[in-house]
């Protein structure tokens, strides 16, 4: 069922990987041995009740893990339960359509999503945070995110060709139309390759994952963003820095072609941006703690001040 749906709806790699994880870790361990025709709504309701008390990460890759007392306290969210419901709803609806079942056992009412208010920074906190970031990769990633409300993958997916310093009467713009992700190689074998623009070479032999560059989610995700004067200057300096780093050792420089690169030319992955941000937060407890994605929500406030 999963590969067929993936092909039919042209799922992105992350979508396939996420749905596969839901099936392996939250559905099969609990109702996987039951006959489909014997499932009733109360079985599904019982599953939701069990999952609501289940610790995050209890199963990984379909295998049960031993968790510490601290890990056992963090249970699955209502949003995750809602995702399980949607997956079951769609799969059993198809079973009815295919004539395998007469009626779907999935209850009409879905578990309620968990809504959490995201923390954002105030204007002065954003200014002070940028001033305190000495890591040039992190500084540029955060600056781009605050100006353009970018996701981590979109920041990592930018290339020098996306930057136009002459656009908008010299104000400058940058275009967002790609996203970088690391996905399981098994996933790549199942998904539509049409959305994948590039698969990066493996850093380690025998790696089970691949770093890819893909189209952004929707046409609305493709956008052109005006630069601020400060970002324009930082981008100019950054591109000069890339040229200098390549000139130091051109034979060993591994030019990934991405905007954000390590000194050796390799692409900066989204997870590295996240780790750098966490490291900075640990070193600066005076700032309200937010996840990197929270910077995207702080972007609207930042844009009002420029």
Where is each model-derived feature located?
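Conserved tyrosine-mediated DNA breakage-rejoining catalytic core shared by Y-recombinases
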Residues: 110, 125, 158-244, 251-254
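Arg/Lys-rich amphipathic alpha helix in sigma70-family domain 2
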Residues: 93-102, 237-240
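Short, basic (Lys/Arg/His-rich) helix/loop patches that form interaction surfaces
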Residues: 56-60, 131, 135-138, 148, ...
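Residue-level detector of conserved, well-ordered beta-strand and adjacent loop positions
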Residues: 45, 109, 118, 122, ...
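Basic, Lys/Arg- and aromatic-enriched nucleic-acid-binding interface segment
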Residues: 57-87, 97-160, 168-171, 211-212, ...
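Short, Lys/Arg-enriched alpha-helical recognition elements, typified by the DNA-recognition helix
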Residues: 1-96, 256-259, 274, 278
